Structure formats: structure tokens, C-alpha cells
From Swiss-Prot:
CDD domains assigned: MoaE
Top-level taxon in the UniProt lineage: Eukaryota
More details: This protein is produced by a bicistronic gene which also produces the small subunit (Mocs2A).
Metabolic or biological pathway: Cofactor biosynthesis; molybdopterin biosynthesis
The protein's assembly and partners: Heterotetramer; composed of 2 small (Mocs2A) and 2 large (Mocs2B) subunits.
Keyword Cell cycle: no
Main location: cytoplasm
Keywords: Cytoplasm, Molybdenum cofactor biosynthesis, Transferase
Function in brief: Catalytic subunit of the molybdopterin synthase complex, a complex that catalyzes the conversion of precursor Z into molybdopterin. Acts by mediating the incorporation of 2 sulfur atoms from thiocarboxylated Mocs2A into precursor Z to generate a dithiolene group.
Keyword Secreted: no
Name recorded for this polypeptide: Molybdopterin synthase catalytic subunit
Amino acid sequence: MDHIKLIRNKIDINHIHQLIIDQSCGACSVFVGTTRDHFEGKKVISLEYEAYESMALKEMGKICSELRIRWPTLKHIAIYHRLGSVPVAEESVVIAVSAPHRPAALESVSFAVDKLKSSVPIWKKEIYENDQIGEWKANMECPWPQFTETSSNAFEYSLCKIERQVENISESKLVQIRVSDIELTRRIKCFLKRKRDEINLHNIIDFKQQLRDSPRAESMLPKDSCARTQSILVKQQQSISHIKVHRAFEDRRQTRPDYSSQLNKLMATKHKHCELVKSNVLKNARLQNIEEYMRITPDDEDNIYNRIKNIENRILILESTSPEYKYYIKLGKESNNINKKESKKGLYQSDRLSEFISGIKRQYEL
């Protein structure tokens, strides 16, 4: 089992020893790192540790995984590191390993100490007796290069291995231009300008209005045109491209395809399809109104016959539960005739309307 932890209190070595001890293991190796009281002639009071905690725990877990790959017989692994202020002679890091045999335990602990110093993002600051601010110490064992004011501006060619193998490359695939940067930039700009002019020329040919009905029509066209406002494009049915339609004037009498009849055929099929869709929409709308009135929730997968059948079943249920729905509520012929008479509208001429208005005035005068 792996035990990894970052703590801010004093590390309990006995507790860690109890975590890694096992009956099947004959060796327990423990490394304890403490704070010494001097460094380069300066008296050290304490050390302060800071860490990128989430990344540090992740890297410590990777160390445990690598230890188990290298030494599969390891039983328990414990890596504890202290953060914050660590006084002199107190423990800052503890690495403990248990294994069946001594060599695996000793070698794995030594490897874990080196790996912890080089890969885990934990930073150390030394507090001296005469300097309470302290000094951050660079980790000389980390794999990445140490940048200084001089090295940050320079490029380390020794870190990049350049393999020079140019002799076997065929000359047909290479183009060598021996000019200055200014000349090379000028050539690139000229190339781009030429390609832009070609595109503009094709746009003028494709989209510019071609009026040939009169000899003066060509002179009336503007010199510059806009493809967005002056172009005429007809979209081809069932295609993602466009057809540019032009009127052709030929001296020779040749048979040309009848484009109008072909377009009419295509448009006829489209109109028929639209009519069918409209008829289906009307039928569905009428059925939907009846279903809403009868409080029936239709299913999207049902066809029209199933929906009519559901309406009939609903009517039968209403007739069975309420007999008056069928027998007692009936409108006679007289009531129908009365409604028809009331709904009938009369037609009056202007002289008849004037007589009617004058009669109303007489009634109010009396």
C-alpha cells in the first residue's frame, strides 16, 4: 500500500514505521531528512518549504508506481514531506519502504530520495541568523536547465542534437534561392499580387453584366462592378453548386437544349410535392382539432387510420358512460331552420336603406 502525504506539523516517524511494517517483510528501510544548522559558513535557523500541492502529490504517486515496477517485491511505501517552517534538527522528509529482502528495500529508498529531489515541485527557503528574510535555494538536481541572466538570452546548442544528413536527399525535390531577405520578401509579395489579379480577372469575367442587346450597352456598363449586387446566379436543384446563365448569340443555326422545358418539368414535380404536403398538413390539422376537443393525445408514429380509430373509440366510451350524449341531446328540424333563417343575410338597395333610416328617425322624433 502507498502512503503519500504533505503535512504542516511535525512528522511522527513511529507512526510511519507502523504503517509500513508487515509480517511477510524482513526488511524496513527508512530515510529521514532533517534541517542542519549551517550552510556555507552561515548559521541556519530554519527552513521554509512551499509546494504546488496537487502536482506534488501526483508526482509522489508516480514515484511509488515506478518503485513497484523496478522492485515488484515491495510491500508498503510511505513518502511524507513537511511544508511550512521546519526548525533545526527536525524532520522535513521521511521515505520508508518494506520488502521481504534487504537489497530491494535499501536500493528503492535511495532511488526514491533522488527522484523526490528531482521531480516533485517543492521549494526550499533558508532562514539565516542575521537575515530573517532568507534566500530561496535552487534545486541543482532538477532535470530542466537553470536559467540565469546570461543563459536566458543565449541558445544552448548542446541541448539540441542536430543530425546533418543532407547528402542523400534528391536535388529534384529542393529549390535553392540565394537572395537576400528583402529580395525574397519582394518576390513573395509579387507572387501574391499576381494571384490576386488573376482571381479578380476571373471574377469580372464570371460576374460582370454582359449586355449585348445594343452596341452602346457595353459602353454604358461601369468600369468596376460588384459581384454581390450585379451577379445573377441560379441554383441547380439537388446540387450544391450554381449554374451561371448567359444568353448566347450564335450566327450558326444549331440545335440547343430546351432549358425552359427541363426547368418546367423539375418545377412541376416540386409543385406536386408541395401540394401533397399541403393536403397532408390540412388533414392533420383537422384531425388534430378533433383530438384536442376529445382530449386524445396522439402518437407520432400512428398513421391517419389509427388516429381515426382512436377517435371512434373515444366516442363509444362517451356514449356508454353518458347515454344522454346520444339520445337526449338532439336538434330538431325546426331549430335547424330557425338557425338557418337567423344566419341568413339580407340584401338591401340604397333607396330601401334610406327608407329604413327615415323610419328610425320618425320613431325617435315621436
